[in-house]
Amino acid sequence: MGPYFTVSPMLTEEEARAIREFLERKSAAEKRMRKESTAQRNRPALEAMKAVRRISETIVHLLDGFSLEVVKGRSVHELLADACRRLERSGVIVDADVVIEELRRRESLGGLGVPGTTLALYHARSFAVLRPSLTMYRLDAPQTVPGMDGEPMEINTVVLLLGPSDADKEMLTVLSEVSSLLVKDEQSLAVLAHGGEEEVYSLVSAHLEQFFDHYWTSMKE
């Protein structure tokens, strides 16, 4: 039972003031409880919208910064070093040397050539990377690199995929989705290995748009 007042038929000024103060406190408490209840109901929706925003921001960064360059007379390591220094100048990374070292470390752990293709995926996460980045490099002559299966293989295209070391799970999901393009279907692989910049961009953007649509639909269910 809540608080109650015993009053005479004719309220004194003190009794009236006590009742008013009680009613004001009760009203304020009820408003606060309603506000907290609404906030708790809305929190899952808010978190879902934040996740969608992080997904879309990652996709925008990747597509905004995408480029495909034909490289002549450079080894894979040389083109990676050049690429990282350009990304440093454009503000994507803050220390090219750190990222170059991380790429070489990843390569030493296992081959990065994708078996059954002419593609190699060089990827790294580092504190020196400020935002996700996807760039590609077409070699003017095939080069031999270790494949992911441990066997040497010839490649004509290097895919460079970078992300911050503190990437959230939404960003990692998008980066993983980009990687999945390299093992998709023969038509997609042909575009990645031989298509021009606009053709490859269209493939990547369509793939990520489809992924985003599916993600958004799943969040609304």
Question: What does each of the following model-derived ranges do?
Answer:
Residues 1-221:
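Cytosolic covalent-transfer regions centered on His/Cys nucleophiles
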